[in-house]
């Protein structure tokens, strides 16, 4: 079938023959189909969606467009976590070495930030020398030596996704559940993971604004991943408030290191343990959820996870001095505070506004080729439920450009809501989704 016929079928919301869809994707990855035709197809998909079989076929074809990794020679199978992105989400930096220190094998292929949500690679690159461009051979060596690696997608790993991701970014076709599903899963499956835990976020600081949107995406990814032979589970987590107390690249690395040293914020530790327990269960570590969390707690508070992170940083070329003494990480030239306008209790923190303030300061990028400022952002965020007196600091703002400071300060100041009545934060983890509890209208395997 010629490309324009496939595009027309999707435009008219008709089913595409699966062999033709697969050939279309593989031809695009080889350069035989131009960007303008794939852009038209992506827009038609964004408008009309895909059925389950089409989504599964798209995912498999994108995975098969390049090389695939295999870790079958290791005693345990490879397991990973993927987050749909949020404000202050530095979980991967803590989770990968934590699970590895409990016997897991974690080859984590991560991405860069775009817009308000930060990228794991940008955060790690605030450690001088840290390499995020490992080849497949280098990746395997790091995993073999320390049990975990956090690196970027290579040109040979799911290249169809790499091309389509860049195209979606500039054609208004990001918000499509089938395209998001195929993008995430093709990379993870190509990286050789046999177990995957998804952190699907909802709320003001995430891509999916409602629980319903997050659930649809989570259920689709669980169903497609399971069909592809991967054990997949998802947690729906609240991103109406920032995660932890810091937003920004080096600031989040600092907080992650402190967490690995046993001094992290409670919400970050809670989410890390929840995801880590599911990863350990997938690789066959015996025990119920409480037992697995206890194993993770022992690895964290004994220092084993920190030592594993330090080893990973060394193996990937990073200077360990910046981990052993994280105060050496890049710092901003100006640090200011946001004072509380009145006394009471903090009852809300708008994650989107906090993320936008950090973005204005230079912590994020508008275009993929833009540079980020590692040093800027927001730290020492007060959290929901905490008491404040008038004039108390609600957050510290870290800036290098004076022209951005005032705009960010005003935006950040408007993100806090104080009331005389005490209010506890809503539950961080909304629900768990597995292949056994998918909605009736989800096509399972």
Language-model region placement:
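Glycine/serine-rich anion-binding loops at beta->alpha junctions
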Residues: 77-116
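Well-ordered secondary-structure scaffolds
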Residues: 5, 10, 15-18, 28, ...
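A glycine-rich helix N-cap at a beta->alpha junction
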Residues: 123-149, 219-229
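Phosphate/diphosphate-binding glycine-rich loops and adjacent basic-rich segments that engage nucleotide
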Residues: 144-193
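Acidic, glycine/proline-rich low-complexity segments that act as flexible tails and inter-domain linkers
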Residues: 1-88, 260, 308-319, 444-445
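Alpha-helix C-terminal capping segments
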Residues: 47-48, 93-107, 187-192, 227-228, ...
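Short beta-strand segments
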Residues: 109, 143, 151-153, 184, ...
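Short acidic, glycine/serine/threonine-rich loops at helix termini
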Residues: 92, 110, 117-122, 153-154, ...
């Amino acid at each position: 079938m010629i490309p324009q016929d496939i595009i027309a079928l999707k435009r008219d919301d008709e089913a595409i023959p699966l062999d033709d869809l697969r050939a279309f994707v593989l031809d695009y990855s080889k350069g035989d189909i131009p960007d303008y035709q794939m852009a038209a197809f992506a827009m038609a998909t964004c408008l009309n969606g895909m059925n389950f079989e089409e989504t599964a076929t798209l995912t498999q074809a994108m995975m098969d467009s390049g090389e695939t990794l295999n870790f079958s020679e290791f005693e345990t199978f490879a397991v990973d976590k993927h987050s749909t992105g949020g404000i202050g989400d530095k979980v991967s930096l803590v989770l990968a070495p934590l699970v590895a220190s409990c016997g897991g094998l974690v080859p984590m292929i991560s991405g860069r930030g775009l817009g308000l949500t930060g990228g794991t690679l940008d955060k790690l690159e605030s450690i001088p020398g840290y390499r995020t461009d490992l080849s497949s051979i280098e990746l395997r060596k790091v995993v073999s030596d320390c049990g975990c690696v956090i690196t970027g997608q290579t040109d040979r790993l799911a290249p169809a996704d790499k091309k389509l991701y860049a195209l979606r970014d500039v054609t208004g076709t990001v918000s499509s559940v089938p395209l998001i599903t195929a993008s995430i899963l093709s990379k993870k499956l190509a990286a050789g993971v046999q177990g995957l835990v998804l952190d699907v976020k909802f709320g003001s600081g995430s891509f999916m604004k409602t629980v319903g949107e997050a659930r649809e995406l989570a259920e689709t990814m669980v169903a497609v991943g399971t069909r592809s032979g991967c054990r997949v589970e998802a947690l729906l987590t609240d991103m109406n408030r920032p995660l932890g107390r810091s937003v920004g690249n080096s600031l989040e690395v600092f907080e992650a290191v402190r967490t690995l040293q046993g001094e992290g914020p409670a919400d970050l530790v809670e989410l890390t343990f929840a995801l880590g327990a599911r990863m350990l269960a997938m690789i066959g570590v015996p025990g119920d959820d409480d037992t697995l969390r206890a194993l993770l707690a022992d690895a964290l508070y004994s220092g084993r996870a920190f030592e594993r992170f330090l080893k990973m940083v060394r193996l990937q070329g990073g200077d360990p001095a910046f981990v052993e003494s994280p105060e050496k990480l890049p710092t901003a030239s100006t640090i200011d505070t946001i004072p509380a306008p009145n006394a009471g209790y903090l009852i809300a923190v708008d994650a989107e506004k906090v993320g936008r303030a950090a973005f204005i300061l230079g912590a994020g990028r508008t275009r993929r080729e833009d540079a980020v400022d590692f040093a800027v952002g927001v730290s020492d965020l007060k959290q929901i439920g905490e008491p404040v007196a008038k004039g108390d600091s609600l957050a510290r703002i870290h800036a290098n450009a004076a022209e951005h400071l005032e705009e960010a300060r005003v935006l950040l100041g408007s993100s806090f809501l104080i009331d005389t009545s005490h209010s506890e934060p809503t539950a961080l983890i909304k629900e768990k989704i597995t292949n056994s509890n998918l909605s009736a209208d989800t096509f399972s395997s």
